[in-house]
Amino acid sequence: MKRFETLSGCACCPVHRRRFLATGCAACAGAASLVGVGRLAHAAEKPDKTRIRVIYALHAEVQPGADWPNVGFDFRPVMARIDAALKQGCPDFEFVTSMAKTPQDAQKIIDGDQSAGVDGYLVYQMNCWNRVVQPVLATNKPTLYADFQYGGSGGYLVYTAGFLRDKRPNIGLVASSNPDDLVAAVKCFDVVKKGGTVEDFAAATARVRKSLTPGPSNMACEPDRLELLDVKDCLAAMKRAKILTVGRTFPDIVPAIVKEMGIEVEDVPYAELNAAWEAADKDKANEIADRWQKMAKTIEDVSRKTLEESAAMYLAQKEVLKKRNANAITINCLGGFYGGHIHAYPCLGFHELCNEGLIGACECDVRSTATMVAVTAMTQGRPGFISDPVIDTSKRQIIYAHCVASNRVFGPEGASNPFEILTHSEDRKGASVRSVFPVGHMTTTLEFGPERKEILFHQGKAVEAVDDDRACRSKLAAE
């Protein structure tokens, strides 16, 4: 764990992180990296200032491996901008900045703070799964938990859900792309400084968040003539369906899927899929690669060889589906690729299957695949979009993100939308899809929990096909 401490006080002090301000001097605008000062300069600050420990939860300053946002991502300028926003927006606060990768790193920081007069903590989830906020919350000090969007969002939402279920009293939440929202939440630490409780702090942050979240915009949607199967025919279609799982590692809910949804599930070894890939017709693969090159709006950092290998993987998926009389396949993609079990990413193959009214699903996510089977049957061919959600309260948006998506969202016979072929985002390898989704339509998000006999359901109006290089390639923002 690399620990850096940066005090925010006088903007001109050379040992402090520089400000990134339009009104600042040119020399100050150039500093992007964290600077370790090695001491706490108490004398430089007024004793009555509210002192906040800022902990960035991340793997490293420059990301070493495949994860959100992406391999090679440089967090240093991001952290510098956050520090600058805090300094500018909260001049009556003192910020002491550190980084932590593990709970043990966080605990060392906490132990060192025992005599440092820290009034509260701001934990910024920069990567998804670094469990840093948990030991911080255990201090019972007021803790503001913030999400670096498209970087820490997965862990942030999962951990936040647990904190809400546990009714943790000392946590405030920020999930906003607007730094002013962060500043407003940080100012709530003064509630405790002035004698309030941690519960008062948490309540104040909630009020601020709600007050800064904009109200609904025009929610009128484009017309969409959706014709659904009746219940009897939909259930019959589900019973005719079969899901193939390759490299299954998700929690075993297969018995519940079979019992409650009537969908058959069958395991397939990597070796069978890889053999079909090796045996795929090279001429057909070349034809498919030609079509992709012709139809894609953009192809970036993906070679012709990779396109042909991806086309062969699509043909392999089709062959295995045909051989086993199935209409859905879900693959533990990265586990197979990095384990040497498969040698081409299946993303473009999934894209093609979904365009055809079949189901290709990422990560051997059998729960989402079963949901897709049911809803594709019910909507008579409309594809699902497995997604990892991101919240942006400043825009009143939820952003759905993944590296596989159809570009025929209204079904195989419906209108198509533009798509781009890019690398798989987290590791910048292989080939995947950015679907430039249509906007103005009502979207419905579902997840079936057959083992609990529950369905999660919400709706939102599609308002933006987000183009951001971080995290998964296809992104759709809904309000």
State each model region's role.
Residues 44-158, 210-236, 259-325:
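Metallocofactor- and cofactor-centric catalytic cores in central/energy metabolism, strongly enriched
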Residues 1-16:
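N-terminal secretory signal peptides
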Residues 62-64, 102-105, 129-132, 152-153, ...:
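Flexible loop/turn segments at secondary-structure boundaries
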Residues 23-24, 161-381:
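Conserved, well-structured core segments that form the ligand-binding/active-site neighborhood
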Residues 47-52, 56, 70-81, 101, ...:
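Anaerobic metallocofactor- and corrinoid-dependent redox/one-carbon enzyme cores
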Residues 14-19, 30-44:
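N-terminal twin-arginine translocation
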